[in-house]
Amino acid sequence: MKTRYSVLSVAMTAAFYTQYAQADLREQCLLGVPHFQGEEVTGDQIMMPIEIEADNAVINQPKDATYTGDVAIKQGNRSLFADEVRVEQNGEQERRAFLKGSYRYQDNLIQAHGRDAAMDLGSETAELQNTEFQLVGRQGRGTAESGSFNHNKRILKNATFTACLPNDNAWSIEGNEMIQHIDEEYAEIWHARFKVLGMPVFYSPYLQFPIGDRRRSGLLIPNFHRSSKDGFAYSQPFYWNIAPNMDATITPTYYSRRGWQISPEYRYLTKLGEGIVAGEYIGKDRLDEYRPDDNNRKRYLMHWRHNMSFLTGWRLYVDYTKVSDKRYFSDFDSEYGSSTDGYATQQFKLGYYQPNYNLSISGKKFQTFDELDVGPYRVLPQIDFNYYNDELVKGGDFKLFAQTARFENDSKLMPKAWRFHVEPTLNFPLANRYGSLNFETKLYATHYLQEKGSSKQADDMDKNVTRIIPQVKVDLQTVLEADKQLFKGFNQTFEPRVQYVYRPYKDQSNIGSGLNQSVSFGYDSALLQSDYFSLFNDRRYSGLDRISSANLITAGGTNRFFNEKTGVEVFNFSIGQTYYLSPSKIDDLSQNSTTKRSSSWALESNWKFHRKWNWHGAYQYDTRLNQTSLANTSLQYKPSQDKLVQLSYRFASKDYINQNLRSNTYGQDIKQVGAVVGWELTDRVAFMASHYHDIALKKPVESQLSVNYNTCCWSANVYVARKLTATPIGSPDTINDLYYDNKFGVNFELRFGTNYSSGVRKMLKKGMIPYTEQYGIN
């Protein structure tokens, strides 16, 4: 799992070169590695016959024999070549060969040469002197004053080891004694000196490192970075291989402006499931600008993710993340969350699943990072039941969904509630070669038991609320294929779709309180974001607390073009709109009602005009706001997995944001352009650069430049980054007051012949806005 060792702090200059090598890096590295010649023999090696060839032989039976001149001794997979060999025999079991002068030893795992050696022909043991060795079929070589080799262990005295190829001494490890464990694929070394270009840079009385693919405990290579906010940072990870099915990484980090942070991560795979438990902790954050209201300077993160299948049909899922404060992900880079998420999720779900029904109990809570007077509700417990039966009614498919949920809020102004919901659905699907027609009837039956908030300022509530809403839906789809080609070489299809939905109006303003409408309606409902595909959703709101009235027709269609020779889709274009025969509303407030007869126009398109090129575009025009509400487009050139260029643009109007989020702090449109380049220049040099700029604010959002230099036995990464960060406490917080964190880092990675990655994909994952692909045609 951890065969790569990351990041020594060094200053380096990346030297770019543009010529391309004849073979990729892995092939180049393996060209410098010896390979076993001939057919590998399996079985007990000491039972194999011994073959001795020489120019001359003096035999003194049955005690000894002396061979001279191009002597070759072969037994199974091992061979010895020397100028002079004396073989001594003591009975049938003990036979030893003594080599004088220069020799060469090889088997299917190692090659060695030197002066003077002894070999036990009755076992798999060899004693070598003044030897140089190289692993067979993988990177790894070294020297030793003396060594004892057997079938599962090599003991070397005054030895060196490196994974670099011959004539490359970029790094090496020296020690008084080294034991290489062959089956376990690791080496132990005592009084270890780590050298770079022959210069000692690190000492340890004891060290372990891999000589294969298996995981081993030990210190990983430290990493460095410097940030304008954190100052100088140094991390020293320690890897602990606890058992074959569990391991851990413990990383202490020192920030010159904050203090010490400890970050343990435990991974497991057991009969009780698989998952990860992690944490990050600073006992006292010394950063001057961090001034919490309660003067508590402890900063921490807790994370637990667990998946489990047990007995027959039972599943358990846990995803729990909690941080000490709202600024945590703005101040610290973490694998377990981001400031752009807006919240941390704490949830679990235990379910029992059968072919025609399932039952689950769950709980969920959100820790928001925005400054909100009233936060979202937590739900515990939530009990869900689903039942499916396609034989209950002839020609129909019956579904039943039922839920019981308890809602509570941290604010004393907010009510508490139990919600009981039943939702039977009956579908009558019809399909033939011309298309499909689906008739659906559904009933939403919900009852609430509400308790007024404990504060005197809390709104009065109806204690018992019952809401029953029937629904009818008709959905028609077909696929039409054009007889003639609009564009030569491309076949065309058109997929029209028409859907009618009817639900009567029910005033739902007495469900929940209006004080938390900045995050939700009722207890867990929010206005859904819309695109072409969401036009055909039954509902405008998520959750169950707001089910808007509906008397509407949604019409749309998708046009597709296919290459007539390969049948591969190269272009599609979708357009649709909803037409309201009567206003859709959830209460009597005008802002929660559709006043126009038609909804937003929604368009979406994808074009793969070359196997290396992709384009995606989406556009929405809001007829209620009489403006473009959302738009985005992206163009990507990707000739290979490690070479890509992507340009993007995103737009969201402030009115659309206010309508959905209701907490648009700056009251500003979002107009953001972005460019990302990830490119493997050669087998050794790769880089990634990205820049995102907000046109509306006329200021950058994030910029990154990262360069990777790769060799057979090490790689180095140098990066610089500048990104928006949280407003320092007490500082001005207006649209013109933006704050940035500037970061510089150098990473080293020792390679032991198991990884030849260019590093492009790893670099693309970094940043506040990571690289994504959103293309509908691959």
Curated annotation (Swiss-Prot):
Residues 1-23 form the signal peptide. Keywords: Cell outer membrane, Membrane, Signal. It is found in: Cell outer membrane. Pfam families: LptD (PF04453), LptD_N (PF03968). One of its GO terms (cellular component) is cell outer membrane. GO terms for biological process: Gram-negative-bacterium-type cell outer membrane assembly; lipopolysaccharide transport. Its main location: membrane. Together with LptE, is involved in the assembly of lipopolysaccharide (LPS) at the surface of the outer membrane. PANTHER family: LPS-ASSEMBLY PROTEIN, LPS-ASSEMBLY PROTEIN LPTD. NCBIfam families: PRK03761.1. Component of the lipopolysaccharide transport and assembly complex. Interacts with LptE and LptA. Belongs to the LptD family. HAMAP family: LPS_assembly_LptD. This is LPS-assembly protein LptD. It comes from Actinobacillus pleuropneumoniae serotype 7 (strain AP76). The lineage of its organism: Bacteria, Pseudomonadati, Pseudomonadota, Gammaproteobacteria, Pasteurellales.
